[in-house]
């Protein structure tokens, strides 16, 4: 800061008023009175030091500053050339300790007007690079630049151990009408604990808040933000990232293993594994079981373990439960180096009311709507973002980009989209406000979701954005230019609900509910669907997937393998929650590890082996994955055999096909004639009743010859055995065809 840059000296009356506000911690323009200012033929330096009894200006030698005993304001008068810039202030506290500090108020503002303009327009996609806390060097002096958005604050201060958590010590500067406050504090380093102390301009209420843009936080139950170091992580996944740009996800197999990092596995005495340990152990396991992607329940920072991460307070911070941001980078990098994609759940639909978080951030409804009919989820006890506010939308868009860019995340599963789309979601009549057209659609949320998808797909080709949307809202996964929301995929909640409802019924009654399995194909290609058997289905008294199944133990496991056979051969990408792949018996509990001891039992080993081979089958046969989203990839053979509760269908890809036959009763269907599209020899390439998987080993010989008998509208047919509570996959044997290497053939009988 040159002499010409010194703030002009305020008039006496103005100065007196300003100092009164400063001392009372309600002043928005501390640079107006603190730091260096022209004074007569020289300059005056002022420092407000609430805990000092004596102070010196850092000239050579140091010169004592005059103290106003009433308010602890220290002044030094002198010639400009005698003052080094930047300069230090030395001060002694009541305990006799001397402190050496560069004066924050001798450094000019750092945020550009252009950055602030973009943020105000809601178009600063990388605003996380300027707001929050960032280690920087200003005029050769290292320190930390703090910036936050709080337009309804009268005063904002940075507080921490470095200033005894006293909001009088480091008041920030309000940047015009932008609502953004900033201050560079020299000498602070990464690892510093801090919060913002805000005083509301209307009520004078004081609010102590974590940093909305904080990139690291204390471990719960503590809530302070931590100044994060600039990353020095050296990524090794360049090849993966380049290939991702060309990833044809529409026509590639995607099989997702959904994971809660805190309860997948635990260490000694129930301790969390760290990101590095999880990377090595989880990647080895996913490679073994054959999934293509891992989807993480939210790793954004959150205060309550029991929320599973869905009540986020740190939208820019990997949770500190498992390690540092760089250790999370290692986790993602390690996955990529082994050919595994990483998706994460992201929660833009609501946020918690915790006092240290976003709620009433500056004493006003800043991030949320003020009217609870718009701004509160009463069922969940959370608040709803105000999507119509540019800066709030920018906050969320920047968060989404942050995870893709800083951590190389391959996609986001957007949580609770239905709650965003409908103004009357889970509300009684009279407890919601219609939109400007009188409807129940949340127009601002719709615009936000479209903008989110437009920005993410434009800036990061190949990245997936998946909607958890539980209603029949049209065109969720259709392009924006045709009126869609622009998501890559949508969870098929209808398939999940109908299928699990059907599978939970005693087989003797299933023939009455046959349409529960066939109905889904009426809309299966209306969206790009993912088939989810997620964490939500194995909690809150719903039971594990295994114990949703009826019958004795043998039948439960057979039903579970049958369910998985249907899932992996049905149109749509796949998602399976951890533990389901080996038949976890208990409901999921986030406070402890999965029951890995179950893999000591052959029947659980069998379920795991079935998942491994279904994954391999799905990934190896284009007929099972290429047209997951298109009707060209599916044909019924027979959907009408409700009397025997048998379904049969083709999955196809450009002339190649596989046949799937599913028997939903414990009665073996011997001499079951099935129409087929081509003559030749058929091979049974998967049988969920195989002894490999814990079944009864009923099935077919390794070759099945067609008969020239027209059947089910097909020119040829085969005579097969369909095992009890089982599914089989058949493939036409041709000279060019190769069976999947690890999918075992049933030995048959």
UniProtKB/Swiss-Prot annotation:
Pfam families: Alpha-amylase (PF00128), Alpha-amylase_C (PF02806), CBM_48 (PF02922), GlgB_N (PF22019). It is an enzyme of class 2 (transferase). Pathway: Glycan biosynthesis; glycogen biosynthesis. It catalyses: Transfers a segment of a (1->4)-alpha-D-glucan chain to a primary hydroxy group in a similar glucan chain. Signal peptide: none annotated. InterPro entries: A-amylase/branching_C, Branching_enzy, GlgB, GlgB_N, GlgB_N_E_set_prok, Glyco_hydro_13_cat_dom, Glyco_hydro_13_N, Glyco_hydro_b. Keywords: Carbohydrate metabolism, Glycogen biosynthesis, Glycogen metabolism, Glycosyltransferase, Transferase. GO terms for cellular component: cytosol. One of its GO terms (biological process) is glycogen biosynthetic process. This is 1,4-alpha-glucan branching enzyme GlgB. It comes from Nitrosococcus oceani (strain ATCC 19707 / BCRC 17464 / JCM 30415 / NCIMB 11848 / C-107).
């Amino acid at each position: 800061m040159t002499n010409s840059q010194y703030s002009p000296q305020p008039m006496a009356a103005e100065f007196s008023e300003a100092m009164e506000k400063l001392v009372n911690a309600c002043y928005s323009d501390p640079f107006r009175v603190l730091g260096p200012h022209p004074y007569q033929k020289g300059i005056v330096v002022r420092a407000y030091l609430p805990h000092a009894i004596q102070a010196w200006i850092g000239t050579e030698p140091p010169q004592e500053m005059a103290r106003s005993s009433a308010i602890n304001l220290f002044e030094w008068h002198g010639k400009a050339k005698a003052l080094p810039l930047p300069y230090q202030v030395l001060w002694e506290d009541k305990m006799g300790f001397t402190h050496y500090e560069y004066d924050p108020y001798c450094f000019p503002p750092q945020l550009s007007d252009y950055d602030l303009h973009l943020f105000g327009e809601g178009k600063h996609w990388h605003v996380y690079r300027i707001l929050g806390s960032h280690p920087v060097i200003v005029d050769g002096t290292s320190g930390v630049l703090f910036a936050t958005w709080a337009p309804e604050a009268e005063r904002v201060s940075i507080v921490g151990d470095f200033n005894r958590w006293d909001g009088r010590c480091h008041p920030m500067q309000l940047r015009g009408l932008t609502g953004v406050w900033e201050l560079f504090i020299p000498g602070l380093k990464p690892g510093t604990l801090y919060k913002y102390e805000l005083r509301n301009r209307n009520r004078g209420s004081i609010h102590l808040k974590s940093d909305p843009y904080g990139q690291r936080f204390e471990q719960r139950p503590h809530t302070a933000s931590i100044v994060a170091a600039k990353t020095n992580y050296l990524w090794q996944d360049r090849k993966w990232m380049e290939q991702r740009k060309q990833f044809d996800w529409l026509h590639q197999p995607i099989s997702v293993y959904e994971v809660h990092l805190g309860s997948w596995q635990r260490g000694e005495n129930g301790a969390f594994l760290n990101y590095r340990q999880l990377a090595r152990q989880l990647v080895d396991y996913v490679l073994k079981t054959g999934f293509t992607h891992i989807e993480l329940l939210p790793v954004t920072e959150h205060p309550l373990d029991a929320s599973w991460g869905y009540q986020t307070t740190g939208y820019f911070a990997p949770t500190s439960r498992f390690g540092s941001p760089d250790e999370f980078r290692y986790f993602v990098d390690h996955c990529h180096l082994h050919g595994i994609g990483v998706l994460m759940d992201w929660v833009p639909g609501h946020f918690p009311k915790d006092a240290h978080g976003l709620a009433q951030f500056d004493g006003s409804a800043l991030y949320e709507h003020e009217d609870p009919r718009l701004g509160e989820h009463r069922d969940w006890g959370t608040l709803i973002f105000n999507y119509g506010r540019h800066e709030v939308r920018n906050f969320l868009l920047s968060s989404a980009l942050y995870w893709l860019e800083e951590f190389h995340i391959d996609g986001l599963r957007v949580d609770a989209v239905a709650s965003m789309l409908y103004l009357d979601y889970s509300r009684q009549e009279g407890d919601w406000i219609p939109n400007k057209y009188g409807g129940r659609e949340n127009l601002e949320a719709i615009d936000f979701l479209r903008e989110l998808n437009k920005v993410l797909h434009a800036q990061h080709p190949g990245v997936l954005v998946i909607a958890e949307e539980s209603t029949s809202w049209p065109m969720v996964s259709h392009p924006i230019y045709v009126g869609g929301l622009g998501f890559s995929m949508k969870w098929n909640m209808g398939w999940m609900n109908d299928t699990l409802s059907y599978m939970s019924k005693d087989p003797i009654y299933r023939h009455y509910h046959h349409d529960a399995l066939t109905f889904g194909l009426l809309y299966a290609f209306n969206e790009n669907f993912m088939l989810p058997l997620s964490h939500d289905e194995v909690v809150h008294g719903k039971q594990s997937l295994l114990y949703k199944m009826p019958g004795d133990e043998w039948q439960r496991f057979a039903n579970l393998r049958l369910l998985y056979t249907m899932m992996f051969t049905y149109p749509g990408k796949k998602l399976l929650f951890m533990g389901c792949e080996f038949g976890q018996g208990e409901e999921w509990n986030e406070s402890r590890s999965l029951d890995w001891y179950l893999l000591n039992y052959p029947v659980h080993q069998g379920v795991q082996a079935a998942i491994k081979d279904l994954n391999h089958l799905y990934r190896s046969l284009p007929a099972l994955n290429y047209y997951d989203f298109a009707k060209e990839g599916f044909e019924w053979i027979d959907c009408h055999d409700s009397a025997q509760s048998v379904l049969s269908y083709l999955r196809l890809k450009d002339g190649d096909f596989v046949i799937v036959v599913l028997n939903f009763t414990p009665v073996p269907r011997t001499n079951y004639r099935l129409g087929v599209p081509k003559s030749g020899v058929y091979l049974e390439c998967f049988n969920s009743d195989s002894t490999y998987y814990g079944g009864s080993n009923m099935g077919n010989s390794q070759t099945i010859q067609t008969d020239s008998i027209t059947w089910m509208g097909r020119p040829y047919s085969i005579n097969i055995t369909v095992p009890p509570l089982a599914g089989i996959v058949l493939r036409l044997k041709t000279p060019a065809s190769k069976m999947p290497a690890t999918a075992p053939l049933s030995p048959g009988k």
